[in-house]
Amino acid sequence: MFRYIEKEARDSITAALEKLGIKVPPEIKLEEPPNPQLGDLASTVSFELAGKLRRAPIEITADIMSVIETPEIFETIESKGPYINFFVDYGRFSSRLLESIQDDYGSHPPRDERVILEHTSANPNGPLHIGHIRNAIIGDSLARILRMAGYDVETQYYVNDMGRQIAMIVWGLLNLDGDLEDYPGDKMDHRVGKLYFEVNQRLKENPGIRDEVDELIRKYEAGENEELFRKVVEYCLSGMEETMKRLHVHHDRFVWEGQFVRDGTVDRVIESLRKTGYTGENDVLYLDLEEFGLEKELVLTRSDGTSLYSTRDIAYHLQKSEEGDVIIDVLGSDHKLAAEQVGIAVELLGGKRPEVIFYEFITLPEGSMSTRRGVFISVDELMDEAHSRALHEVKKRRDLPDDVADDIAESIGNGAIRYYIARLSPEKHIVFRWDDALSFERGCASIQYAHARACKLLEKASFTGEEDIEDGWKPEGDERELVRLLARFPVVVEESALARRVHPVAQYAQDLANTFNSFYRSTPVIGSDFEGARLRLVDSVRKTLRNALNLLGIHAPETM
């Protein structure tokens, strides 16, 4: 509906310019005035025409205003200096908007574009930790937004089964007493992490172990010990997938790094790069990128001839280039150089350079799970802590059966983590503060509470969805602001998808929840003269909040 009123405004200006014999510019720009008293939309078309017509913008606006016709969706069109301001007829517009809001509100028609979005892709050498969580949340939320915007999206997890870390774990299984089941931990990824830590300690004591690990890597590339390597990786991934499922993070496909060595793709990549004329060789084969503005070369092989992560990454991106129209990677800001190097190499071989979303890191304040004898904080621990803190808040507020309180706490705890991370642009560093994350006055809990409050009000009113919108209903104040916000939701989805950003959806959800809570306190619904219209408005807010939270991977509870 917001795009509809934009179209009506542009069409009215176009018709006016044609009447005046003025050539219509390629784009008639519209903006939302900062003050609603200045209208719902404003056009700066007179500024755009001033140079070509050699006239003052205010004179051009006066001419346009003398012939412009007001579309029925607008109450009036006024000039404010050189601006042309459009005021929506909220009596007419609000009814149309509420009639249009269905369960899938915010969804866009399918686009003929396939997106391959890789995210998380943590090495399977232990549990996911706080350093991985922002990647997973940005990637999963963006995939949801892109799908709602009409894109065909496949999310991928790139499994590093050929890295040194996995070879170290395999060395541990071959040389230390016991199997993975013998290590402490409730989940397999934690047991793998314990073994990896132990091997690291042995390596510090005996650096000669490194040669044995290198030999394992060579043998694995040649096809030996495949079963053991796969066992280690699958064990660890099973635990990591449990964590991601609890956090509502989903991957459509797991792509194993080793496949590109096994099927000869890496060899073909190396041979193709040699033919570009940009490679050099000393102890290792490398790609000279100085001509592309990078002083640091990209090393393609080890001195013993085995492939490196970078080479296999190029092979993987070439596969993604064949499978998708748009390639998106989510990476930490410390990967900027490597991503630039791989992007150049992929383009040299005719592939698509990926769009990369870089993010800064997340930390916990000192004393808040941040230092546990120097060991990283796992995502499992973070979620357990969030659940525990949320359960405490829930029990303070209501006397509920344990199982109900537990479910609500899980919803609030996971929502707190996902929302707190999604709400900021990826370029900003995050310090995770529990009091802010779990606040019922701000943050995700307040949004979930607004949804639950809407559900309760509709239940109390025995709402059916068939209620009539009364004649004469013309929203004002918070009611009107709710209508304005509801109309914008599809635009927020579209713009977030195009910008490849998640935080505008998070901010929108907070704005909608805040406005609804204000409306709830100030505006009577049940028993009012406009009960039908207001119940329909509340139901539209419920649907939109639910859909916005779903885009962020957050459950919208019906009770809190």
From Swiss-Prot:
It holds the Pfam family Arg_tRNA_synt_N. Its main location: cytoplasm. Keywords: Aminoacyl-tRNA synthetase, ATP-binding, Cytoplasm, Ligase, Nucleotide-binding, Protein biosynthesis. SMART domains: Arg_tRNA_synt_N (SM01016), DALR_1 (SM00836). Its EC number is 6.1.1.19. It comes from the Archaea. GO terms for molecular function: arginine-tRNA ligase activity; ATP binding. GO terms for biological process: arginyl-tRNA aminoacylation. It catalyses: tRNA(Arg) + L-arginine + ATP = L-arginyl-tRNA(Arg) + AMP + diphosphate. It is an enzyme of class 6 (ligase). A motif ('HIGH' region) lies at residues 122-132. InterPro entries: aa-tRNA-synth_I_CS (IPR001412), Arg-tRNA-ligase (IPR001278), Arg-tRNA-synth_N (IPR005148), Arg-tRNA-synth_N_sf (IPR036695), ArgRS_core (IPR035684), DALR_anticod-bd (IPR008909), Rossmann-like_a/b/a_fold (IPR014729), tRNAsynth_Ia_anticodon-bd (IPR009080). It is found in: Cytoplasm. GO terms for cellular component: cytoplasm. Belongs to the class-I aminoacyl-tRNA synthetase family. NCBIfam families: argS. This is Arginine--tRNA ligase. It comes from Methanothermobacter thermautotrophicus (strain ATCC 29096 / DSM 1053 / JCM 10044 / NBRC 100330 / Delta H) (Methanobacterium thermoautotrophicum). The gene is argS.
